[in-house]
C-alpha cells in the first residue's frame, strides 16, 4: 500500500441521518470508497488522512438502481460504503479536517 493509493481510496464522507446517528452513538464514520478498496487499505487511509486510531472496518456494496431514460433502460453505478469504527477515546471532526486540508 503506497501513500498515493491510500489518498485515493476514500472518495467522500457520507452525510445522512443514519450516518449522523452512527457517529454519535457508536463512534462510527461512514465513507464512500473505491469499489476495489480492501478493509486494510481503508483502515490505513483513515489513519493516514485523519490521524485517528481505527478499531474496525465494515464494508457494504450498494448495487446501482435500474433507471429508465426514455425508451432505454440504464443502470446507475454500484457504490461501496465503509463504516469505520474508531477506537475508544478517538474522535473525528470532518469539518475541522476539511478546514485543515484547505489551509494546506
From Swiss-Prot:
Keywords: Ribonucleoprotein, Ribosomal protein, RNA-binding, rRNA-binding
Cellular component terms (Gene Ontology): cytosolic large ribosomal subunit
Xref: SUPFAM superfamilies: Ribosomal proteins S24e, L23 and L15e (SSF54189)
Subunit structure: Part of the 50S ribosomal subunit. Contacts protein L29, and trigger factor when it is bound to the ribosome.
Other remarks on this protein: Present in outer membrane vesicle formulations which are used as vaccines in human.
Family membership noted in the UniProt record: Belongs to the universal ribosomal protein uL23 family.
Protein name as it appears in the record: Large ribosomal subunit protein uL23
Protein's organism: Neisseria meningitidis serogroup B (strain ATCC BAA-335 / MC58)
Gene that encodes the chain: rplW
